[in-house]
Amino acid sequence: MSKVHNSEYIKELVVDNTSYKIYDINKAASDIGLPLKKLPYSLRVLLENVLRTNGNKENLLVFKEWLKTKKSNTEIDFMPARVLMQDFTGVPAIVDLAAMRDAMQKIGCNPLKINPLIPVDLVIDHSVSVDSYGNKESFDQNVHMEMKRNIERYQFLKWGQQAFNNFKVVPPGTGICHQVNLEFLSQVVWHNDGTAYPDSLVGTDSHTTMVNGLSVLGWGVGGIEAESAMLGQPITMIIPEVIGVKLIGKLAGMATATDLVLTITEILRRKKVVGKFVEFFGNGLRNLTISDRATISNMSPEYGATCGFFPIDQETLKYLEVTGREITQIKLVEKYAIEQNLWYNCEDTQEYTEVLELDLSTVYSSLAGPKRPQDRVNLNCVASNFQNELPYFALANKDIDKKYAVANQNYAIGNGDVVIAAITSCTNTSNPSVMIGAALLAKKALEHGLNVKPWVKTSLAPGSKVVTEYLKLSGLDKYLDALGFNLVGYGCTTCIGNSGSLNPEIENTINKNRLVVASVLSGNRNFEGRINPLTKASYLASPILVVAYALSGTLNIDLTNTPIGANIYLKDIWPSQKEIDEVIANSINSSMFIEKYADVFNGTKEWRDLQITTGTNYNWDKNSTYINNPPYFDNIGSEHSIKDIKSARILAIFGDSITTDHISPAGSISKNSPAAKYLIKHHIEPLDFNSYGSRRGNHEVMMRGTFANIRIKNEMCNGVEGGFTINQLSGVQQTIYDTAMDYKAHDIPLVIFAGKEYGSGSSRDWAAKGPGLLGIKAVIAESFERIHRSNLVGMGILPLTFTGKNTRLNLKLDGSEIIDLIGLSENIKPYNLVKCVIKKQTNEISTIDLILQIFTENEINYIKHGSIMQFVVESLKG
């Protein structure tokens, strides 16, 4: 098929006397016999992207072929309009770019070739912790501590802002990247050099998907994949299956958007939508605001989908107007969407791989927990759910009734008591309905004489300054303050594990009595050990229920039938939707968005006063424990090939649902960990360890932190929690890091075995970089989460899955086996079968087939070059 120059599909679109070029997908579809209105809206956006960036008729025909079977095995190149980053993943990405510049210089090439070709926005939101809480000074104190801890990282980011084109930093204390993206950065229709096209992006955070609620196609990728995208490399992908979710009816009773997303997460996780697009349609859309939709799209990683997409409609325009977008931009969005058949039409006949239906009126008030976001629990069943789960917590006190006195306090705590109640996360703080609802419930609680229990650590950390502005304007902020939900920061805080310490007396009581206490938060993840090392149980809930559980102080009562106070029930203080809507109508306007985002890139005086060095290449400080030149390019220019893996050892065997939190924790650094020993050796006191997430710019810390989660369970070490394994060279139980270094010294390759959903959770590429630096060559699992699989490939690690009924369990592996992986040397292709030879200590040898989970020829190239970063440098050197 001949190449068709895509200029034949350019047409003019005039909006308010301004002329734009657009790429006409109606004409392109007609030319290849593609019935455009049968294509899901999300795929129409992809079709335009392919048409505009590569007018190859074969690529366009892929969409026509997709309609026949509603799936595809053909890859396309996706070129996002921009990249979004947060600081935990953004710092290592900029470290990589700085290292790439050094690598280019090393091989005699122009280092300035390493420069973003598309807009990149980095929002600093992951570094603030809840050190101070429950008072009016908490925000200032936490911001001060954040700047003090992270000054070196922030200086590095400011260097990056002057060193790289198209790179902007939103300073700390401003907001959460996804809420800033939703309220300010996103355009829905982008325009550049006179051409208009759908806004799209990839982001280095898995919850980048939130923006699909605003009809902007985007998803999370690892930092290394984002780096290649900003340097002009396409995101290669197979056109995904698209699951249509038909929403009908309207939320009723006490149900909120949070309850809806927890319900959707439960349904879709069970449906197994990993690697698929989800698209929402139906008459229920008219009853969901953009804020509601954004809540649903935000949790796409939790239900496993690549994205949860909502098409453009009147709600999109209303949201753009209320958030202060220019009227000319809003008109462009409307006219472009209608012209290109991207405007939602309930009479369209779009076809999906599969269709599910959900009646919104059936959604019930819910929480999710205690360990996974897909484990939804009806509000009236939370107490029984926790009590049923209690026996399954390792090393826990199982007595549900006994209370233990807290030293120097006049109260006692026990299993199931709530010690953290956090209104946190862009998932919910971007939604005025649940935020106003929480404030109204606080008001009514105080009017009924209720108060927060003294053992509960409370906090409010919204995703943008607009939230505190409308709470203040409505007069409701004082009620949240009175209950201890004072502003602690504009950032991710508790949702990502930056919950800060508990009262020392409470911590001692928990540890001494092995209590399973709980956190209740309005976040999106609750994996064990994530929120706080001492809260083994964590439940996700709406901000309204977060306040309710702070009042009750325990999970062990049914809030639907048991009074919170003296004859006061939850239903007595629950705000009606009418009350909430009235406050929203009187308190939220476009001027507050315009005002709060006018200086979004300026930051505080402390930020502006940061002194930095300038220059094209970064001046590395060898003594730094935050920013270090990584070793990824030490062998740049060497020959590239893929070889069979011989005589590998098993470093660890893991069960199901091993998350990227388990693999590369983001939270506190344990005082007895290999990372702690490294920091102490470099004269860093425990008080100044900061977190793993903050030290992702230093590979020495991060490789030591790999598999160092205190709750991870390696099946090679029965009954032991934490990052330990058996060193087969000595037979001794050691840390995973020390064992890996011993194997590396003996030039022994390593593999990991695991169960289902390996690598679920955050997009963090350190969950692939760390294993790569430990010497892991392959991960063999029952299934992989989408982003993590890509990250493994991007770091040159082979993702392999079992065939048939084989699993780590029925193979009866104990970790002493020697592994050969055969079939990698010659003409390797996506989805190849690989022979796995397992040699047991008894000299018994068995051979099984594995499937190579590499999807595209580009991914084969990444493996051949050792990593996507080396591939990019090699591609640019010419």
Swiss-Prot record:
Pfam families per the record? Aconitase, Aconitase_C
UniProt GO MF annotations: 2-methylisocitrate dehydratase activity; 4 iron, 4 sulfur cluster binding; aconitate hydratase activity; metal ion binding; mRNA 3'-UTR binding; mRNA binding
Pathway it belongs to?
A: Carbohydrate metabolism; tricarboxylic acid cycle; isocitrate from oxaloacetate: step 2/2; Organic acid metabolism; propanoate degradation
Which EC number(s) does the record attach to this protein?
4.2.1.3, 4.2.1.99
Q: Can the keyword Lipid metabolism be found in this entry's annotation? A: no
Q: How is the cofactor bound?
A: Binds 1 [4Fe-4S] cluster per subunit.
Which cofactors are reported in the record for this sequence? [4Fe-4S] cluster
What general EC class does the enzyme of this chain belong to? Answer: lyase
Q: Name one GO biological process term.
A: propionate metabolic process, methylcitrate cycle
Q: Which PROSITE patterns match?
A: ACONITASE_1 (PS00450), ACONITASE_2 (PS01244)
User: What interactions and quaternary structure are annotated?
Assistant: Monomer.
Q: What does this protein do?
A: Involved in the catabolism of short chain fatty acids (SCFA) via the tricarboxylic acid (TCA)(acetyl degradation route) and probably the 2-methylcitrate cycle I (propionate degradation route). Catalyzes the reversible isomerization of citrate to isocitrate via cis-aconitate. Could catalyze the hydration of 2-methyl-cis-aconitate to yield (2R,3S)-2-methylisocitrate. The apo form of AcnA functions as a RNA-binding regulatory protein.
Kindly provide the name given to this protein in its UniProt entry. Answer: Aconitate hydratase A
Task: Report the source organism.
Answer: Rickettsia prowazekii (strain Madrid E)
- Gene behind the chain: acnA
